[in-house]
UniProtKB/Swiss-Prot annotation:
It holds the Pfam family ABC_tran. It comes from Mesorhizobium japonicum (strain LMG 29417 / CECT 9101 / MAFF 303099) (Mesorhizobium loti (strain MAFF 303099)). The gene is nodI. The complex is composed of two ATP-binding proteins (NodI) and two transmembrane proteins (NodJ). This is Nod factor export ATP-binding protein I. PANTHER family: ABC TRANSPORTER ATP-BINDING PROTEIN, ABC TRANSPORTER ATP-BINDING PROTEIN NATA. It is a peripheral membrane protein.
């Protein structure tokens, strides 16, 4: 099957940058850019958004410093995607103010977006274009000429580790390769801020670790990243700071380890295989706190050996001792486990 190449109609479409077409003669993409000198990349102040009678984002406030990876951590329905859409000016808040790269949003969202790269949750690549053509076409949405795009495409292919796949159709790529291409495409305009919505959802562990390694490379370049995720390990590995969301509210904010130390502060003993309510009286005297979720008993114990001693001889029990993590923080703050 032959690959679909850019035809005459595609090339004519590329002659006029998309931003210029949208602006109907207004200032071109290169004549004005967001403020890159600000120490605050993103600021939400008292932002609220409702759909009908349902409050999706509830008086949310947070700030993201330039050069940091900031996580929005929460289950589906916590408001993560709505926050991302408001940040991009695609959804208007009902109340509060949003500033992105020194620009008020949504009032000047078009200007702000010139300094933003977006990696959506689901790939929206052109399946019949080649890897190189996907990058070339996307560059036009930022007012880049073919020559300008071609000058940066080799470095983007190297970043995505797709040098040998430059002329392959997207449909020929693995899931991990597609995510890397989507990341490379988001970098075509050398953005100051990168917004990533659930970047590793649906990927196998190997591909997930590859994406994490590429994200760390972006942070080393001084890029600012806002990451929405429900993967606790992802947030712990990548985020300098994060905001824990529950029903659109900011219920905790800080560095991953700082949040763990503040809200948990000790090791966790997970107990399976018995009635957790029957075990409470045995382990409670030796635990700072106990949480029950389904059939699992979580004991936050300064001295786990004392808990283990109390449970010796009880048939069918399984014990798992582990360090505290962000899952425990979420359970502590909300009374339930993180759900996909």
């Amino acid at each position: 099957m032959l690959k679909r190449k850019l035809g005459p109609e595609d090339l004519r479409r590329l002659e006029t940058p998309a931003i210029e077409r949208e602006s109907h003669g207004q200032t071109s993409a290169k004549s004005s850019v967001p403020d890159s000198a600000s120490t605050v990349a993103v600021d939400f102040a008292g932002v609220t958004k409702s759909y009908g009678n349902k409050i999706v984002v509830d008086e949310l406030s947070f700030s993201v410093a330039s050069g940091e990876c900031f996580g929005l951590l929460g289950p589906n329905g916590a408001g993560k995607s709505t926050i991302a859409r408001m940040l991009l000016g695609m959804t208007c808040p009902d109340a509060g103010t949003i500033t992105v790269l020194g620009v008020p949003v949504p009032a000047r969202a078009r200007l702000a977006r010139r300094g933003i790269g977006v990696v959506p949750q689901f790939d929206n690549l052109d399946q019949e274009f080649t890897v190189r053509e996907n990058l070339l076409v996307f560059g036009r949405y930022f007012g880049m000429s073919t020559r300008q795009s071609e000058a940066v495409i080799p470095s983007l292919l190297e970043f995505a580790r797709l040098e040998r796949k430059a002329d392959a159709r997207v449909s020929e790529l693995s899931g991990g390769m597609k995510r890397c291409l989507t990341m490379a495409r988001a970098l075509i305009n050398d953005p100051q801020l990168i917004v990533m919505d659930e970047p590793t959802t649906g990927l196998d562990p190997h591909a997930r670790h590859l994406i994490w390694e590429r994200l760390r490379a972006l942070l080393a370049r001084g890029k600012t990243i806002i990451l929405t995720t429900h993967f606790m390990e992802e947030a712990e590995r990548l985020c300098d700071r994060l905001c824990v969301l529950e029903k659109g509210r900011n219920i905790a904010e800080g560095g991953p380890q700082a949040l763990i130390d503040e809200h948990i502060g000790c090791q966790v003993m997970e107990i399976y295989g018995g009635d957790p309510h029957e075990l409470l009286s045995l382990v409670k005297p030796h635990s700072q706190r106990i949480e029950v979720s389904g059939e699992t008993l979580y004991c936050y114990a300064p001295d786990p050996d004392q808990v283990r001693t109390q449970l010796q001889g009880r048939a069918g029990l399984r014990l798992l001792l582990r360090p505290a993590n962000l899952e425990d923080v979420f359970l502590r703050l909300t009374g339930r486990e993180m759900e996909e």
